[in-house]
Every structure is written in C-alpha cells, then in structure tokens.
C-alpha cells in the first residue's frame, strides 16, 4: 500500500503501508496519520474517512489469502451481528449486489405475525388457522419480546423468530433463540428438510430477501404436522439451496471462477457442509484459513479495497 491505512472493525484493528499488512486486537499506530476505513453501517469517529461494505472487505481478504486477483467471483457473506450480502465481483464490472439484507421493522415474533396477516388474504387465513390449531403457541408468539442481542443480521433474525414460531423458545434473548433452532436442527439425522421459502422481492434498493415468506412457509409446515427437528433443519438446508441458486445466477451473469464464503453464520457446520455439497460440484469454494471468517477478515480486507 502506498499510503498508511487503518481500519477498526468489531474489536479488530488492521494496518497497512509499504512494508506490509497486519491485523490484531490492537495495532500501535504511533500517532501517525493514516487513511481510515469505516463500515457503511458504523458512525465514523473522525470527519474524513472512506466508507466500505463489510462483505466486500471479507471477500477481499479471501482473495489475498488465496491469490485470486482478477478472478470473477460470487461472494456469500452471512454475518451473525452485522449486515449480510450476496454479490458478484469482476474486474470489469466491480462489485455488483445480487441480494441485499436490510434491517427492517420485523424484529419481534408478534411483528412477524402481523406482517404475515397483512400480506394478503392467504396470509390472513394462515394466521387465523394457526391460532385455532395452536392457541397456546399463538399466545406465546404474541407475548414473547426479544430484549437481549436484538441488533443482529437478517438471517439471525429469521432463525430467532422461527424458533419461537416452531415452539422451541419462549425467552427474551434473540441470539439464544437462534442458537436453539440451530441446536435442534443438528439433532435431525435425515438427508433433506422441507423447502423453507428464502425468496427475494424487488425493491427500490434492489433485490431483497423477504423474511415473511420464510416464516410463512414454516407455519404451513407446522400445520401439516412436521416435527420440530425436521422443520428446524429445513431452515438450514433451504438456505444452502438458496446459496447454490444465487451462485448459479452469478455464474450466468458474469461467468464466475469460484465462490467465497464468509461471516459468522458459516460457523454452523451443518450449513457449511450443505453449502459445500451444493456448490463444490461446479465451483471452487474459498474461505479464510489464516484469518477468522468474520471481523478480523473484514478489518484486513477493508484497508486493501480500491487496489483490486
């Protein structure tokens, strides 16, 4: 790097200059002036900064680790606490968003109930039927309020709310609820789960994942009598299928040479292995080996953005 650059991201600091790159919990800058990078969703502490998309930085760190310069890639970045993103990259076009994940007003289970009820007539009938069939569970969904760890990514929110709808969790910690769904899914010993609807809708910002459809499909399966283990696994298995489909879309658009996987959601071994099974037949898969798959990789990748 020609100019000294610095980034602090979720407890990790990265610094780079003409002598190389380093990342750690704390980097000694020795009061020198640096170009500072700040994630798009964060508030800068100084006036002049360069804003960046964490998903792009995560991919950039993988590119550096695996020497993938000038390769066209599909990036899958699923963080637990920070914005997730599916996108493609090529040297000719740059970074192109494919599916965006935006924080929305559906942060509580009862918010989701109302959102599904007001979608359309089918949604209203589904909620009414759910209430008649599972009156106690319906009351629980209506009363549960997440108070801890509510600032999570959209995928984490979906899984957290799903655990309540399935009947796995009645507490107030969103992350704990998400982990309950994951631990239940691990106990499923079958090969495939029900098709949970991870679908995108067109918005002014681009194609965006609609969380209502995922929970709505789970409600239908619950009414059909699927057990908790199978239904929980469906959320993991169907997300892996969604990843594979988006990768094929990226390949059709720009002709990718591989896929990068990053973000804390991929600490879920079940999801990671299902994703590998769906992708590895057609595409090389790359992820961080020397860096953590979230946070540290983002900090290091950020300071090299712009040098692609």
Predicted regions and their residues:
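Acidic, glycine-enriched active-site microenvironments
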Residues: 1-308
